[in-house]
């Protein structure tokens, strides 16, 4: 029997020829001997052979016609279903006879593209040697059918209830409002980046390069300094109004009267050019028109028309901002991003006010005792959580405080700290910035050798703790040799650090989760305390006196939270008071 077929022959044709060869094979093999025994005449034999061959051919033809008729009915039903309303025949519910079809999940029939992909993947998984042109044509027919189903509109695949749900979701004012606020926050982030980049470029690049970057936003007739100043002023004014708008509305749905007063909350000047832009925006319906209208509105916003002022009365802040513009306020490290300030100028202005407030606070002996005791209790609580004896720390801490309170050592201490970059002898610059914030930054990027020891699973926890403490002591010992004053303030600080640094390092970097949680809570409370101190909404920058009162209130509240978490008794009885009578000489205005 011949099972080979030509390259251009289809599967059906090859099957038909194979079946047609069966009678010939039977006749040549068995027919001659069997028919010879029957002793039929040659004519009768030919009639029987022709009858058998015709029967086989007729059966094959009937089967082929039946398949074509079934395909024609299916195509007609599909076309008619799409015309009438639209559900294709393949999606209509049909009777499922096999158990395999009943076990099909609905997720498999939700997407027609998944069907076509499964079909094509099944065809492509066949052996390539068994493919013929007919198989390729069959695959192409399946692909075309599936692609035509995919190309059909989404309506037939979705019920009217789903359409109504989507329309209600898209037209829901609350969802649209929340989406708009998310985009608004993204725009705020971009504006902040633009302002920070512009300020850094002005401080790090020549004026000619800054002019090239800001040339598109500034008028051609102005000088380089005025161009950068006007552009920065525009950005500051825009950010200020945007922050006010964001705080006023937030992410929740505002009341109707607040939405009606949206125009007033922006506080944009209603000039004639803006009225024309508003009328243009009302007539436009595309996002491109809105985008260009917003760009033109930003160009019409002038620095002289919208001054950069805080929402609350902040006379002290405004005076400090003037000093910042004249370059009279300096710092060791800019903490703009960490403390959530608008820009570097905003940070410097608030820093100047905070310095003056701490000077007012520390004029009172009770406040000096309060801040010194709070710091001691916090570190003691951390060491107790780490199961360490705080006796050595307490002795060195008291000795450092006695040295710092001696007025005859201030000149030496100032010279030491100036060599470390501290530009102001203030509690904030020394205790909060130089000691605490630098310690947190150092712990965020430890040496690779220390990390290798801590991440070694074959070493015990006690060995890791001992190795980390030895590394800290070695670093402090090497730094002691480089001190300009062997028995100065830095030397006393290193004596305290010998007891505290290993505990903090093992707490932040070590494998003990409970100790790590305690150290992270301690860090977060300190950082949030500083953020509240530099927030115009949390403290009053109207006068130095009011700012000092708010900082003392923040210090009491944060110390109660942190000491309560560490299980240490609070120091309420040592809370001092803010001096009422202060002179301008004391404030260094």
From Swiss-Prot:
It is found in: Mitochondrion outer membrane. Residues 87-134 are annotated as: Disordered. Keywords: Membrane, Mitochondrion, Mitochondrion outer membrane, Transmembrane, Transmembrane helix. The chain crosses the membrane at residues 11-31, 42-62. The keyword Transmembrane applies. GO terms for biological process: mitochondrial fusion. One of its GO terms (cellular component) is plasma membrane. It is a multi-pass membrane protein. Residues 106-116, 123-134 have a biased composition (Low complexity). GO terms for molecular function: protein heterodimerization activity; protein homodimerization activity. Belongs to the mitoguardin family. Homodimer and heterodimer; forms heterodimers with miga1. Regulator of mitochondrial fusion: acts by forming homo- and heterodimers at the mitochondrial outer membrane and facilitating the formation of pld6/MitoPLD dimers. May act by regulating phospholipid metabolism via pld6/MitoPLD. This is Mitoguardin 2.
């Amino acid at each position: 029997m011949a099972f080979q077929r030509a390259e251009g022959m289809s599967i059906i044709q090859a099957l038909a020829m194979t079946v047609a060869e069966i009678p010939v094979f039977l006749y040549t093999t068995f027919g001659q001997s069997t028919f010879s025994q029957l002793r039929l005449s040659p004519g009768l034999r030919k009639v029987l052979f022709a009858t058998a061959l015709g029967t086989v051919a007729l059966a094959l033809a009937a089967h082929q016609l039946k398949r074509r008729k079934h395909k024609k009915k299916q195509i007609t039903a599909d076309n008619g279903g799409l015309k009438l309303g639209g559900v294709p025949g393949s999606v209509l519910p049909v009777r499922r006879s096999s158990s395999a079809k009943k076990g099909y999940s609905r997720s498999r029939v939700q997407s027609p593209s998944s069907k076509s992909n499964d079909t094509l993947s099944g065809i492509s998984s066949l052996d390539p040697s068994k493919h013929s042109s007919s198989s390729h044509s069959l695959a192409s027919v399946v692909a075309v059918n599936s692609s035509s189903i995919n190309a059909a509109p989404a309506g037939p695949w979705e019920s009217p209830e789903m359409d109504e749900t989507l329309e209600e979701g898209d037209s829901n004012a609350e969802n649209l409002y929340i989406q708009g606020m998310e985009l608004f926050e993204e725009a705020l982030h971009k504006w902040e980046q633009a302002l920070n980049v512009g300020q850094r470029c002005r401080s790090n690049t020549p004026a000619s390069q800054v002019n090239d970057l800001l040339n598109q936003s500034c008028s051609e007739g102005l000088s380089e300094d005025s161009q950068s100043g006007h552009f920065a002023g525009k950005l500051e004014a825009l950010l200020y109004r945007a922050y006010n708008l964001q705080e006023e509305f937030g992410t929740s749905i505002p009341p109707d009267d607040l939405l009606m007063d949206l125009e007033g909350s922006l506080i944009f000047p209603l000039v004639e050019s803006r009225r024309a832009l508003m009328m243009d925006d009302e007539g436009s319906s595309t996002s491109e028109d809105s985008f260009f209208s917003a760009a033109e509105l930003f160009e019409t916003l002038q620095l002289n028309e919208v001054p950069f002022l805080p929402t609350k009365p902040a006379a002290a802040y405004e005076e400090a901002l003037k000093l910042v513009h004249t370059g009279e306020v300096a710092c060791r490290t800019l903490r703009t991003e960490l403390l959530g300030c608008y820009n570097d100028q905003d940070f410097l202005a608030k820093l100047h006010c905070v310095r003056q407030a701490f000077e007012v606070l520390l004029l009172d002996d009770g406040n000096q005792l309060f801040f010194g005791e709070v710091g001691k209790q916090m570190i003691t609580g951390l060491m107790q959580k780490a199961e360490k004896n705080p006796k050595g720390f307490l002795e060195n801490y008291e000795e450092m405080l006695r040295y710092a309170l001696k007025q005859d050592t201030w000149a030496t201490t100032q010279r030491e700290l100036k060599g470390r970059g501290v530009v102001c002898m203030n509690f904030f610059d020394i205790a909060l910035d130089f000691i605490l914030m630098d310690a947190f930054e150092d712990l965020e990027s430890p040496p690779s050798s220390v990390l290798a020891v801590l991440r070694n699973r074959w070493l015990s926890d006690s060995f890791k703790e001992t190795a980390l403490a030895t590394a800290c002591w070695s670093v402090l010992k090497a730094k002691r040799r480089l001190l300009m004053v062997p028995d100065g303030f830095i030397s006393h600080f290193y004596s305290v650090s010998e007891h505290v640094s290993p505990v903090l390092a093992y707490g932040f970097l070590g494998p003990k989760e409970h100790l790590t949680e305690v150290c992270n809570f301690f860090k977060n409370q300190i950082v949030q305390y500083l953020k509240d101190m530099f927030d115009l909404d949390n403290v009053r920058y109207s006068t130095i006196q009011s700012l000092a009162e708010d900082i003392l209130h923040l210090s009491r509240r944060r110390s109660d939270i942190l000491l309560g978490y560490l299980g240490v008794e609070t120091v309420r009885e040592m809370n001092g008071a803010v001096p009422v009578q202060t002179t301008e000489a004391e404030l260094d205005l």
